[in-house]
Amino acid sequence: MLFFTSCFNGSRELEVPKSKHIYINSISSASSTELRVKAGITIPLIGANGNSENDIELSAHHNSTPIVVKKDGASFIIKLDRELNANDEISLIATSEGIPSISTVARVLGAPKLLRAKGEWVHFDEGSSRVQVKLSIEPTKEVAYYRLIVRSKWYSESLGVSPGTLLERKIVTLGNPLFPQQKDQLFNEVNNAPFALLSLKNESDVTFSYYDVKLENSPDAPVKMDWEYSAEVELQRISKDYYLYLLTCMDSENNNAFENPIKIHSNIIGGFGIFEIYTPLTTPILIK
């Protein structure tokens, strides 16, 4: 694997590595008792030989207490005996013979406090509608960083579509366009889906909208369908490092790498990648 982004504990300009380095990518929820850590070795453009991903050794600590790490292919599995709480820390050290060791720490932040989420259908045109949502969050004294995800679904018992049907993630547009929505497609191979980023301080109300299809019975329809609608918002409290990582990944997607140097933020000391444990909170959107 060739890496064309240099991420040594911060942002640097585009650079093809002249020597091998360890990279780590791990994004997990604090509500999980299993952390999966992807690890590998960057390969110089010329003279690639020697170490493979199988040569990496990983050690982990939970609040300075060693924890068991198991190898699973190119990944490592860390089993925890409980869910993580605010201010818990997980630290990692990865080594491989002849390559500089790397280290990183993820600290769990307090869960966001959602006060309410109210939505309203505000526009529909040719089958495409929009839901305007006002999200009220308990303000924080310091700057807080969030990733916002919206899911929705239609269901009908008479048509055999149960309330348990999985919700579909929606494209989110912020009312105050802080940042455009993007797709989480770097280092997230399974759940390619839209999200929005927020940075807030002493603010409690966030306005955003998302597009959906509004199913309505025609007044002259002989049979009325019992469609029901459900939507929810997931607010993830994330670290400043992960926030900057996502922003710089967005920039690298939107810019021409051969015209503008790519800068990808990292919290891996001595290597590449990101280590993040976010704190999620999901609440239903009450829609008129």
Task: For the regions a language model picked out, list residue spans one by one.
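Sec-dependent bacterial lipoprotein signal peptides
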Residues: 1-6
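A sequence/structural signal for flexible, mid-protein segments enriched
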Residues: 7-288
